[in-house]
């Protein structure tokens, strides 16, 4: 099997896991939350998800291409764990509606993403640059998630 097909299979499996973990009430979940200022609409979040999987594909492809090198094992394993953790976050946020748990899970997720980035630096420059874009996005995601939690904790207390 070639590296493009394997990378595509990895990303497809990750996307399917994410959709299954989130469940069917994604739009309703967004509607019931008090969103922070500067929150994009759900369609933009879908586009962000597509870009996330494009980055994951680039990273997976770059790690899988050519003859196998054991040095690529760690970043590839970290990528798979990160994609699994992303599905877990969707489960906590959408299906369980556990805003506090999803915020708590975001902390080790971000650390894992940073460790993946560092591991990519010594292995593949293109993959590390592509993944760096995702790390930049995570700063906004962190602000948004914690602002969301604050807004909804405050609105729950006021009710």
Task: Describe every region a protein language model picked out.
Residues 119-159:
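Terminal transmembrane helical module of multi-pass membrane proteins
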Residues 91-99, 115-129:
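Membrane-helix boundary connector in multi-pass membrane proteins
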Residues 80-89, 102-116:
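Hydrophobic alpha-helical membrane segments
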Residues 24-40, 149-159:
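Cytosolic, membrane-interface loops and tails of multi-pass inner-membrane proteins
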Residues 1-21:
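N-terminal signal-anchor transmembrane alpha helix
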Residues 54, 58-90:
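Helix-adjacent hinge/juxtasegments
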Residues 2-9, 71-80, 127-130:
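Interfacial segments of alpha-helical transmembrane regions
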Residues 38-54:
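Interfacial helix-start motif at the membrane-water boundary
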């Amino acid at each position: 099997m070639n590296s493009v097909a394997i990378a595509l299979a990895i990303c497809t499996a990750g996307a399917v896991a994410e959709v299954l973990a989130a469940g069917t009430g994604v739009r309703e979940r967004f509607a019931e939350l008090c969103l922070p200022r500067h929150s994009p609409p759900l369609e933009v979040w879908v586009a962000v998800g597509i870009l996330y999987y494009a980055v994951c594909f680039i990273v997976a492809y770059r790690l899988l291409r050519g003859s196998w090198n054991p040095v690529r094992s760690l970043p590839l394993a970290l990528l798979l764990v990160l994609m699994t953790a992303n599905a877990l976050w969707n489960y906590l946020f959408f299906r369980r509606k556990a805003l506090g748990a999803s915020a708590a899970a975001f902390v080790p997720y971000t650390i894992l993403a940073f460790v993946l980035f560092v591991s990519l630096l010594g292995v593949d420059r293109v993959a590390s640059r592509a993944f760096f874009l995702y790390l930049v996005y995570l700063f906004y995601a962190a602000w948004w998630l914690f602002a969301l939690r604050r807004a909804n904790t405050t609105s729950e207390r006021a009710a």
